Amino acid sequence: MAPNIRKSHPLMKMINNSLIDLPTPPNISTWWNFGSLLGICLATQILTGLLLAMHYTADTTLAFSSVAHTCRNVQYGWLIRNLHANGASLFFICIYMHIGRGIYYGSYLYKETWNTGIILLLTLMATAFVGYVLPWGQMSFWGATVITNLFSAIPYIGQTLVEWAWGGFSVDNPTLTRFFALHFLLPFLIAGLTLIHLTFLHESGSNNPLGITSNCDKIPFHPYYSLKDLLGFMLMYLPLMTLALFTPNLLGDPENFTPANPLVTPPHIKPEWYFLFAYAILRSIPNKLGGVLALAASVLILFLSPLLHKSKQRTMTFRPLSQLLFWLLVTNLLILTWVGSQPVEHPFIIIGQLASLSYFTILLILLPLTGALENKILNY
């Protein structure tokens, strides 16, 4: 019998073990679709980004007009740009849902997979931030100024660090050129980290909604989940195309249609919607260093999830009290996102402070306590 190339060829064997014959739990729900959706998002972003980079000029005098030129004169340039800009929003929707799934179903107990995932999130945030600066509109310029300036809160080396990052004494041409270089480089770093993330995942196999081992009744990934993922792709591309074709500027800031002007500060400087929750936490502390630390903690707190798991059950499927807290946390993040988009005035200041406090309280105190309480109730 002729050897099966899919199982004998070194490269094909690797692909086969990752995407075709991969043993998968039979009961994973649609919440497990987001990993593959993130992969498709990354591929879409790299492709559209590459096409945009061919027409972009990383120079303060030309950046804004080169983007306008892409939209006006390049064949389907407007579509490529709209897909790239809105694709970033979809990327973040998928990654936040992916993380939410991880918290709900206790996937963070696969520590290596979880930690590489958080590093992926941080890299994605950095990529999105430097990318937002490239069109060189008002919000691009001032967003870059405000966010990079936060590093000056670091004692002793802060100011030097910021000037080193800027390549001068303010955000200017050197800043734009290096941000373009970084924005081109980081997605490939994300792709590399994704492979590491998957390697760790395939060491242990996927978790499932029951949080119990499913080794005895696993099914092959293809055709079952390859088909299920295909449905996910279609359901994701539908809102992306709708956004890009009907309301491409819905999630953008009107301020960015004005070319960058260092002499005019926009009335409300705010980042893209996917950073607003962290921005609200940053603003809710009336001290620069304190705010920066809270901002960092808002994402880095995820590293503590495996250590704060006190329940004897892995998932929240059969833990109604923890479920209540989880959905409170989700609502809390939505409130923070809304507050981050509002001006710094009453009542938004106090709402933001309370929401920030409850965000950390739920994650650090209430969830572990509830896990322990549920153990007690169930006589574990």
UniProtKB/Swiss-Prot annotation:
The keyword Cell inner membrane does not apply. A ubiquinone binds at H202. Heme b b562 binds at H84, H183. It is a multi-pass membrane protein. Its cofactor is heme b. GO terms for cellular component: mitochondrial inner membrane; respiratory chain complex III. Binds 2 heme b groups non-covalently. Pfam families: Cytochrom_B_C (PF00032), Cytochrome_B (PF00033). Heme b b566 binds at H98, H197. One of its GO terms (biological process) is mitochondrial electron transport, ubiquinol to cytochrome c. It is found in: Mitochondrion inner membrane. Keywords: Electron transport, Heme, Iron, Membrane, Metal-binding, Mitochondrion, Mitochondrion inner membrane, Respiratory chain, Transmembrane, Transmembrane helix, Transport, Ubiquinone. Its main location: mitochondrion. One of its GO terms (molecular function) is metal ion binding. The chain crosses the membrane at residues 34-54, 78-99, 114-134, 179-199, 227-247, 289-309, 321-341, 348-368. Belongs to the cytochrome b family. Component of the ubiquinol-cytochrome c reductase complex (complex III or cytochrome b-c1 complex) that is part of the mitochondrial respiratory chain. The b-c1 complex mediates electron transfer from ubiquinol to cytochrome c. Contributes to the generation of a proton gradient across the mitochondrial membrane that is then used for ATP synthesis. Heme 1 (or BL or b562) is low-potential and absorbs at about 562 nm, and heme 2 (or BH or b566) is high-potential and absorbs at about 566 nm. The cytochrome bc1 complex contains 11 subunits: 3 respiratory subunits (MT-CYB, CYC1 and UQCRFS1), 2 core proteins (UQCRC1 and UQCRC2) and 6 low-molecular weight proteins (UQCRH/QCR6, UQCRB/QCR7, UQCRQ/QCR8, UQCR10/QCR9, UQCR11/QCR10 and a cleavage product of UQCRFS1). This cytochrome bc1 complex then forms a dimer. This is Cytochrome b.
